[in-house]
């Protein structure tokens, strides 16, 4: 059994007292200006194993092809995709951002704690000290009203993650009747 970690939104997070990316045979990181490791779009795959040369050849021939019809924060997954190309410009920015990752994540944790304390909701997702809080997620009953009130207070909101079975690529393959 091979383990591939998805660390796209978890730069700096910890699981079982170890940094994300140190548990499996490979780990995939995804970069974007709005993510914890803020840099131009791209990604990185780190492979821990004997067949690195074989894996490297396969991976080098791939590029990002999965997301289609993106408008703002709305998108659909219509095919399998990759996003792990890297150029020198992005790498230099990433190296500098890596130096700031811990302090930036501490600030995110502070903001998440404040949101958790200040937002009066019946259902809350528990705060975790090992989470890097790429995004602070909540569930509300009246989404439009909530988003309007947040906007009135200059707080940006968005709907970022649709359930996977509602995306084109997966909806014919997976039926999740209780979601």
What residue spans do the PLM features occupy?
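Conserved phosphate-binding and hydrolysis motifs of nucleotide-dependent enzymes
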Residues: 17, 43, 179
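Short, flexible active-site-adjacent loop segments at beta-strand->alpha-helix junctions, enriched
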Residues: 7-9, 33, 43, 65, ...
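PLP-dependent aminotransferase class I/II
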Residues: 14, 50-179
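Residue-level micro-sites within transmembrane alpha helices that shape
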Residues: 4-5, 34, 40, 86-87, ...
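Structured loop/turn residues at beta-strand edges in well-structured enzyme cores
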Residues: 21-22, 38, 84, 131
């Amino acid at each position: 059994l091979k383990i591939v970690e998805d660390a796209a939104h978890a730069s700096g997070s910890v699981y079982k007292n170890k940094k994300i990316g140190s548990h499996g045979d490979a780990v995939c990181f995804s970069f974007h200006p709005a993510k914890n490791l803020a840099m131009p779009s791209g990604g990185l795959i780190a492979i821990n194993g004997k067949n690195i040369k074989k894996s490297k050849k396969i991976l080098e021939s791939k590029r990002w092809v999965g997301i289609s019809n993106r408008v703002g924060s709305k998108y659909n997954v219509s095919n399998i995709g990759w996003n792990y190309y890297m150029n020198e410009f992005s790498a230099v920015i990433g190296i500098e951002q890596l130096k700031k990752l811990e302090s930036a994540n501490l600030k995110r944790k502070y903001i998440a704690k404040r949101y958790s304390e200040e937002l009066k909701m019946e259902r809350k997702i528990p705060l975790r000290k090992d989470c890097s809080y790429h995004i602070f997620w909540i569930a509300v009953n009246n989404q439009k009203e909530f988003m309007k009130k947040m906007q009135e207070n200059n707080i940006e909101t968005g709907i970022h993650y649709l359930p996977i079975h509602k995306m084109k690529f997966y909806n014919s393959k997976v039926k999740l009747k209780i979601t």
